[in-house]
Every structure is written in structure tokens, then in C-alpha cells.
Design a protein with these regions (language model features):
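Small/polar loops that bind or transfer phosphate-bearing groups
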Residues: 5-6, 30
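Short aromatic-enriched loop/helix-cap "lid" or pocket-rim segments at secondary-structure transitions
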Residues: 15, 41-43, 115
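Residues at the starts of beta-strands that form the adenosine-phosphate
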Residues: 27-28, 99
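Catalytic-core segments of class I nucleotidyltransferases/pyrophosphorylases
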Residues: 1-2, 9, 18-22, 34-37, ...
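Nucleotide and nucleotide-moiety/phosphate-recognizing core
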Residues: 14-16, 25
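Short beta-strand-to-loop element that shapes/binds the nucleotide-sugar donor at the catalytic cleft/hinge
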Residues: 28-44
Length: 134
């Protein structure tokens, strides 16, 4: 089944997400996305800044994009406790058991965690909402 946090907008191709999940044959697949360049990057050595990059566009790290495909049998396999945060104990257990695959999405993804995010996404909606493009 599909699961999402519901606090992000994206043009994720759900068919490709499902295809990756089926190919990897794991209990869960997470959508991995590049982080948005919201903050500047600071490289520090011996308490001295040796590089500063304001809102870098390139970041080789990926973050949890909040869109998942889960097998129903995973609830029996990883013994989940009640009232646990999905991105903590369950995802850590799945990772340790090598049962968490990743679908890498390089298209549009943006969180809506703050009023600032909401305002930005509303402006995009008025112009040309990239999450509505095929």
C-alpha cells in the first residue's frame, strides 16, 4: 500500500515508485529526494570557517521525501510498537534488516512545514505549479 506524510508536494511518478518497489522486493520503499537549498552550508575545521556557500544548489545527500510503498507483512516482520514515529524505530529496523529500498526522485519536491513554505507554494500554484506537470 501507499503511504505519505501529507506535508509535501511533488510530481513523483507513482508508477516508477511502485516499479522500483517491485524490483527490489523489500518490505518498504522510501522516496529519496535532494534537500531544498534552504540554508547556507558552512564547512568548519578547528573552529574556523574554511568554506561558506549560501544556499548551495548541489548536495549529494538525499532526504526522506515522505512517499512510501509498504508491504502489509512488514508489520509482522519488524514488530512495531504502538505510537511510534515511522521515521524513527520502524525505518531504522528496516534499514538494519536491509528491507528498505529507495526510489530516487529528481523532479519537483517541496515540503510544507511552515507558513513561509505555504506562501511559496501558493505563489507557484498561481504561476505554473510544477507538481501538476506530467
Amino acid at each position: 500500500f501507499l503511504m505519505t506524510y501529507g506535508d509535501g508536494l511533488s510530481n513523483i511518478n507513482l508508477n516508477k515508485l511502485l516499479q522500483t518497489h517491485n524490483q527490489k522486493k523489500k518490505l518498504a520503499t522510501v522516496t529519496a529526494v535532494p534537500p531544498i537549498p534552504r540554508f547556507g552550508a558552512v564547512r568548519v575545521s578547528n573552529n574556523l570557517v574554511n568554506k561558506f556557500n549560501e544556499k548551495p544548489k548541489e548536495n549529494k545527500n538525499l532526504i526522506n521525501g515522505g512517499f512510501f510503498i509498504l508491504e502489509t507483512k512488514l508489520f509482522k516482520k519488524i514488530n512495531l510498537k504502538k505510537n511510534v514515529m515511522w521515521e524513527q524505530e520502524p525505518m531504522i529496523k528496516l534499514t538494519k534488516k536491509k528491507q528498505l529500498a529507495a526510489y530516487i526522485h529528481k523532479g519537483f519536491w517541496y515540503p510544507m512545514d511552515t507558513e513561509r513554505d505555504q506562501n511559496y507554494l501558493n505563489e507557484l500554484l498561481k504561476k505554473n505549479a510544477p507538481w501538476l506537470k506530467k
